[in-house]
Regions:
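A helix-centric hydrophobic-segment signal that preferentially recognizes long
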Residues: 1-183
Length: 183
């Protein structure tokens, strides 16, 4: 009788341990999905601001059609991207295009003094800060999840339960390079 009870207790402990490992991996995966939704929300907010910014700049920078077209095209690509990987890539392209647009705006003092432009620029900067924070949160969640599924004993069950490694959000190549300062 005692060996049966010990056997039942051992089985219950093993099942509870596996359930705990599984629940931990599910929780971490769900945190990644939630963090991605936070990024997506901020990217959508930024995408909604861009048409107003482009219209404001058009009136002042008539000779900068290539830059404006690059921003519009990058925004359209970002809006139409469907997978997280495609959105990450499109976001990097859009961030670079916006950086170029604001560099062009420096050459137009009247544009820089325009109240609407200043408000849009401030709102975009605020949104960029929120996107940056959301990316950091996402990457933290991805790191925690990847560590969880790659360490023992969870690594044994991660494959069985189809938990796959996730990729973090990487900065665009242009963002990695230090800006050139000339005096």
């Amino acid at each position: 009788m005692i060996p049966v009870i010990i056997g039942i207790v051992v089985v219950v402990v093993i099942v509870c341990a596996i359930a705990g490992i599984y629940n931990n991996m599910v929780t971490k995966r769900n945190r990644i999905d939630n963090a991605w939704q936070n990024i997506d929300t901020q990217l959508q907010r930024r995408n909604d601001l861009i048409p107003n910014l482009v219209e404001t700049v058009k009136g002042y920078a008539k000779h900068e059609q290539d830059t404006l077209a690059a921003v519009v095209n990058a925004r359209n690509a970002a809006v139409s991207a469907t997978t997280p990987e495609a959105k990450m890539e499109a976001d990097n392209v859009l961030t670079d295009a916006l950086r170029q647009l604001f560099a062009v705006a420096e050459a137009y003092p009247d544009l820089k003094a325009n109240t609407n432009f200043m408000q849009l620029q401030a709102t975009l900067e605020d949104t960029e800060n929120k996107v940056s924070y959301a990316r950091q949160s996402y990457n933290d969640c991805v790191l925690s999840y990847n560590n969880a599924i790659q360490t023992f004993p969870a690594v044994i069950f991660a494959g069985i339960f189809q938990f796959k490694e996730r990729q973090g959000f990487e900065a665009a190549e242009a963002a990695r390079q230090a800006p050139t300062v000339k005096f």
